[in-house]
Amino acid sequence: MPEQLKQRVETCYQQAEAFFKRRFPRPEVSFKLRGQKAGVAHLHENLLRFNLQLYRENQEDFLRQTVAHEVAHLVAHQLFGDRIQAHGEEWQLIMRGVYELPPNRCHNYDVQRRAVTRYIYRCPCPQSDFPFTAQRHKLVHQGRRYLCKRCREILVYSGETRVE
């Protein structure tokens, strides 16, 4: 699957070279991106990072729009330097003129949030559930104490967890 994506990066560069009549150095392409971002262009490293999960779930639009979006960032940087805005007129020119695509800043892919376990802490106050993250729960085990803002008592782990 990543081969199609790499081929689209190459196609975008060939389009930019034909349009601007000059060569551009090819970037390193990485698939080590997670979370809500579909892609990221690292301008000074000449690196493109893509989210494989979002690519798999939105392949057609990803290849057409997202890859061109990120390549346009690198091309704009190589043409116009550091002093341009990320989604400014230079980048928009490349999106419209070179790739004939709308210069959309953000994708609208459905991003699934991963399930997160919360550790329930309580104090003597009525209805006093305090859901702690795994990181905060670990800090309590290492000796950190948290107080209720109302009664100023130390929050105590209830033994319960819930998945959000």
Curated annotation (Swiss-Prot):
The record's PANTHER family line, in alphabetical order, gives: PROTEIN SPRT
InterPro entries, alphabetized: SprT-like_domain, Uncharacterised_SprT
Classification via Pfam families: SprT-like
State the free-text cofactor note: Binds 1 zinc ion.
Any single GO CC term annotated in Swiss-Prot or TrEMBL for this entry: cytoplasm
Output the lineage of the source organism: Bacteria, Pseudomonadati, Pseudomonadota, Gammaproteobacteria, Pseudomonadales
Catalytic residues, per the record, are 70
What's this protein's name? Protein SprT
